Swiss-Prot record:
PROSITE patterns named among the record's database cross-references: AA_TRNA_LIGASE_I
GO molecular function annotations of the record: ATP binding; glutamate-tRNA ligase activity; tRNA binding; zinc ion binding
Enzyme Commission designation: 6.1.1.17
InterPro entries given in the database record: aa-tRNA-synth_I_cd-bd, aa-tRNA-synth_I_codon-bd_sub2, aa-tRNA-synth_I_CS, aa_tRNA-synth_I_cd-bd_sf, Glu-tRNA-ligase_bac/mito, Glu-tRNA-synth_I_codon-bd_sub1, Glu/Gln-tRNA-synth, Glu/Gln-tRNA-synth_Ib_cat-dom
Free-text function comment from the UniProt entry: Catalyzes the attachment of glutamate to tRNA(Glu) in a two-step reaction: glutamate is first activated by ATP to form Glu-AMP and then transferred to the acceptor end of tRNA(Glu).
Protein name: Glutamate--tRNA ligase 2
Encoding gene, per UniProt annotation: gltX2
Length: 486
């Protein structure tokens, strides 16, 4: 099945939001296809009738599109080896179950969930790995009729042969599993739907998948799938198992570690380019020592040889840092469109503002943004009255010298001796001459009065955004409030 043009697949289950680890798997498959000029197939594994929904499928597809991870074949109508939803391929799975039944490679199992749990508990108490012990492996026809008369509906289990299962992993090298350690596994559930490993083998074969790239938590599944490939007479694809994303406690990343879905990072205001850049470098040597790489550079440099074998710890602080770099480099026109939904979510109607003012506002706050969602607090600081004074700003306003600086500034502005072309520079130069204040003693009182904080956009830009009238009003309010800080 190996070819010069690889066919890889991303096959998520629409049972919840797209996990960041699954997004990384999708990205690796996408990179592999784009690097080698192959094709990426999107397959929806929706045989879990209770948990799979079209709503989750739609959100999953939307997240992939947001990441710009396009596919060449999938449920949207592209491709000739569909359908690309497993729920639409049930007849195919049933036909191959019949083949395995005919060949004696499978048998019906009537064990209940309670019986299986009891067996599992017993094995664990003896410090043995849980596996099916073959209770129903050699039932007679009479046994089966008796159990079915009790209303039991069978699952179908694959007869596992003893002996080693070996395969060459493209990332990890030679891998070896013992068949007897696996136990006879279910390939079809009692409701007639195929189990994961059975459906995957059939789908990968008929979709002509050449390379399966997925997380290391699927290593044991690969051993199971290779048994099925042999039984069905299919040539197996190549396999590559990349490392998992870990939390700071070095356990598999989960909700208890914080944000874990692509949707959550979208809502936090992470840029897709920043997220992909971070995921590409996480636990790999693709960046060759560089922190920031363009998507084109990542495609060119991508190789499974550079994918890490050891689990990689997810560092959200580093992602935020990387995101800030992307925001700061984003052209204002493009950034405004990305900020628009976050401004509106914060409760402001962007359409009420004139375009030149909006452009200036975004340029002013851009160096201070870590995420797109940060824009809300800066808009509030600029457009809402009265401005909220935080504790650090209040401490500045308590200082004796502050009142003198602010009163002098207000007086200078009201005298109206400055041109509007370079208003800020002229008025601050005059303020420095009159008060003798320099550095923080000059600028910090002004910042605290106008913005309510001691950090933020450059003051000259704040002056322009607020306008002369608003600057005067905020100075007056700060002076009137000083009695409350004493």
């Amino acid at each position: 099945m190996n070819s010069t043009k690889p066919r890889v697949r991303f096959a998520p289950s629409p049972t919840g939001e797209l996990h960041i680890g699954n997004a990384r798997t999708a990205f690796f498959n996408w990179l592999y296809a784009r690097h080698y000029g192959g094709k990426l197939i999107l397959r929806i594994e929706d045989t879990d009738r209770q948990r799979s929904t079209r709503a989750f499928e739609a959100r999953l597809i939307d997240d992939l599109k947001w990441l710009s991870l396009d596919w060449d074949e999938g449920p949207d109508g592209k491709g000739e080896v569909g359908p690309y939803r497993q729920s639409e391929r049930l007849d195919l799975y049933e036909s191959f179950l019949k083949n395995l039944q005919k060949d004696g490679r499978v048998y019906p199992c009537y064990c209940t969930e309670d019986e299986l749990e009891l067996e599992r508990t017993s094995l664990l108490s003896r410090k043995m790995a849980p596996r099916y012990m073959g209770k129903c492996r050699n039932l007679t026809e009479a046994d089966r009729r008796r159990l079915e008369a009790q209303g039991r509906r069978p699952t179908w289990r694959f007869r596992v042969s003893q002996g080693p299962v070996l395969f060459q992993d493209l990332i990890r090298g030679t891998m070896k599993f013992q068949g007897e350690a696996v136990g006879d596994f279910i390939i079809v559930r009692s409701n007639g739907t195929p189990a994961y490993n059975f459906a995957v083998v059939i789908d990968d074969h008929f979709m002509e998948i050449s390379t399966v790239i997925r997380g290391e938590d699927h290593l044991s599944n690969t051993a199971i799938q290779l048994m099925l490939y042999e039984a069905l007479g299919f040539e197996p694809p190549e396999f590559a198992h990349h490392s998992l994303i870990l939390g700071k406690d070095r356990t598999k990343l989960s909700k208890r570690h914080g944000s874990v879905s692509v949707r959550e990072f979208r809502e936090k205001g992470i840029l897709p380019e920043a997220l992909l850049n971070y995921l590409a470098l996480l636990g790999s040597s693709i960046g060759e020592g560089r922190e920031v790489c363009s998507l084109e550079e990542i495609i060119t440099a991508f190789s499974l040889d550079r994918a890490g074998k050891s689990g990689a710890v997810f560092d959200e602080d580093k992602l935020l840092w990387m995101n800030s770099l992307y925001i700061h480099e984003e052209p204002a026109i493009k950034l405004i469109e990305r900020l628009r939904p976050f401004i509106e979510k914060a409760g402001y109607d962007v359409n009420k503002w004139e375009t030149p003012w909006l452009d200036r506002m975004v340029e002013a706050v851009k160096p201070n943004l870590t995420t797109l969602a940060d824009i809300g607090s800066y808009v509030k600081m600029i457009v809402e009255e009265p401005v909220r004074i935080d504790e650090d700003a209040a401490a500045v306003l308590r200082e004796t010298e502050t009142q003198m600086v602010l009163r002098t500034l207000l007086q200078l502005i009201e005298e109206g001796k400055f041109s509007h072309e370079d208003f800020y520079s002229q008025v601050m130069t005059a303020l420095r001459k009159v008060t003798g204040a320099r550095g923080k003693r000059l600028f910090m009182p002004v910042r605290a009065a106008l913005t309510g904080t001691t950090r933020g956009p450059e003051l000259d830009k704040i002056f322009v955004l607020l306008g002369e009238q608003s600057v005067k009003e905020r100075l007056k309010k700060a002076l009137n409030m000083q009695g409350n800080f004493s």
